[in-house]
C-alpha cells in the first residue's frame, strides 16, 4: 500500500537494495533510479513529501538530517579558494578566470543571456503549470499543488492526454538493445565499430571497457562504460577524459580513453535492466560528448579532443 501506483520494477529494485544490506522490506534511497519513480508514480503523498524534503535538503543544514552531512563549510571554502586562485592569476574574480577559455566574453554577458532566457521561457512555464493545476483540480479534486505533487500529476496528465507512460516504453529499451543500438548508429554515421574487452582492470564489476575502431581497423580510442547507480557513486551522468591523445616524447602516440558514466536502474532478479526513454537519450547524449574526445586527430594534449573545445560549447556536440 505504501508504494501503490508504482510499476512492479521499482518495488522489486527497492526490495533488492534492502536485501543487499540484509534488511527487511524495501529500501528507498535518494539515487535517481529510486527517487524518481516514487515522485512520479507513488500514490502515497506523504511518502512523496518525505522523499522530496530529504532530497532537496540533502547535505545541508536543513531537513530531516539537518547538519549531519552539511556541505556548507566545504562550499564556502571552495568559493574562497577559487577567488584566491583567480586573483593570484590576475583576474578580478573566478567568473572572469572561468570565462577566459570560453566563448562568452564576460560575466555580464552570461547574466544577460540567462535573464533573457528566463524572460522568454517563463510565460510558457506559467501556462503549463496553470494547465496542470486545472487538470489536478478537475480530475482529482486537488485544490493546491505542492512541490512533491508536480511530477506525479504531470505523469497523470500525460497519461490522460496521450495514453502513454514511460513505464510502457521501458520494455522496448532493455540495456543490451539500447547499448547495441547506440553502437549501430555510431557505426552507420561514422564507420566506427565498438569492441568490448574483458582483460582490462575496472573499479567495479558493473564497469565494462570498449575500444573504437574505424573502417581501416585503426584503434581510435577507448572508453569505460559505468551505467548503474550504486551506493557511494556520484549521481548524474557525465563523460570525462581518462587520458587524452598525445604524441609522447619517445614518438609513440597515446590514444584517448574516456569515462562514460550514468546512474541508471540496474538489473533485478536476473532480468535485464529496462531503460526509460529519458535514460536512452542520456546514454546517447553522454556518448556524444565522448566522440570528439575519442575520435580526435590532434596530437597535442592541451587542444586534443574536448580540451580544444570552449567549455560553454561542450553541449553543442552531443
Could you describe each region identified by the protein language model?
Residues 1-30, 76, 81, 87-266, ...:
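Active-site-proximal, well-structured secondary-structure segments within enzyme catalytic domains
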Residues 41-62:
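Short, charge-rich amphipathic alpha-helices with coiled-coil/heptad character
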Residues 219, 296-318:
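Acidic/histidine-rich catalytic neighborhood
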Residues 191-197, 292, 298-304:
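Acidic/polar loop patches that form or flank catalytic/metal-binding clefts of enzymes
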Residues 56, 228, 265-268, 288, ...:
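Hydrophobic alpha-helix feature that most strongly marks membrane-spanning transmembrane helices
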Residues 67, 71, 171, 175, ...:
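Alpha-helix N-cap/helix-initiation motif
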Residues 22-26, 32, 42, 60-65, ...:
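Substrate/cofactor-recognition hotspot
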Residues 83-86, 90, 186, 266, ...:
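Active-site recognition of the HExxH zinc-binding catalytic motif
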Amino acid at each position: 500500500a505504501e508504494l501503490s501506483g508504482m510499476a512492479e520494477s521499482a518495488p522489486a529494485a527497492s526490495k533488492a537494495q534492502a536485501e543487499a544490506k540484509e534488511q527487511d522490506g524495501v529500501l528507498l534511497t535518494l539515487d535517481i533510479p529510486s527517487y524518481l519513480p516514487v515522485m512520479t508514480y507513488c500514490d502515497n503523498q506523504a511518502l512523496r513529501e518525505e522523499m522530496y524534503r530529504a532530497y532537496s535538503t540533502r547535505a545541508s543544514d536543513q531537513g530531516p538530517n539537518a547538519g549531519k552531512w552539511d556541505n556548507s563549510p566545504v562550499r564556502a571554502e571552495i568559493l574562497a579558494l577559487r577567488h584566491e586562485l583567480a586573483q593570484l592569476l590576475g583576474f578580478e574574480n573566478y567568473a572572469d578566470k572561468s570565462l577566459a577559455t570560453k566563448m562568452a566574453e564576460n560575466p555580464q554577458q552570461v547574466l544577460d543571456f540567462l535573464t533573457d532566457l528566463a524572460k522568454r521561457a517563463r510565460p510558457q512555464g506559467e501556462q503549463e503549470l496553470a494547465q496542470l493545476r486545472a487538470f489536478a483540480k478537475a480530475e482529482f479534486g486537488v485544490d493546491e499543488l505542492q512541490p512533491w505533487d508536480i511530477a506525479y500529476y504531470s505523469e497523470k496528465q500525460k497519461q490522460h492526454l496521450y495514453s502513454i507512460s514511460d513505464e510502457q516504453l521501458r520494455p522496448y529499451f532493455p540495456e543490451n538493445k539500447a547499448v547495441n543500438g547506440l553502437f549501430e548508429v555510431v557505426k552507420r554515421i561514422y564507420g566506427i565499430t565498438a569492441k568490448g574487452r574483458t582483460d582490462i582492470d575496472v573499479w567495479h564489476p558493473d564497469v565494462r571497457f570498449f575500444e573504437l575502431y574505424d573502417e581501416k581497423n585503426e584503434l581510435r580510442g577507448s572508453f569505460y562504460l559505468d551505467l548503474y547507480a550504486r551506493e557511494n557513486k556520484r549521481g548524474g551522468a557525465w563523460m570525462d577524459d581518462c587520458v587524452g591523445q598525445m604524441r609522447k616524447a619517445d614518438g609513440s602516440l597515446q590514444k584517448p580513453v574516456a569515462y562514460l558514466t550514468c546512474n541508471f536502474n540496474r538489473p533485478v532478479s536476473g532480468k535485464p535492466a529496462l531503460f526509460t526513454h529519458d535514460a536512452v537519450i542520456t546514454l546517447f547524449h553522454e556518448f556524444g560528448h565522448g566522440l570528439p574526445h575519442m575520435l580526435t586527430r590532434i596530437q597535442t594534449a592541451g587542444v586534443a579532443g574536448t580540451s580544444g573545445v570552449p567549455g560553454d560549447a561542450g553541449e553543442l556536440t552531443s
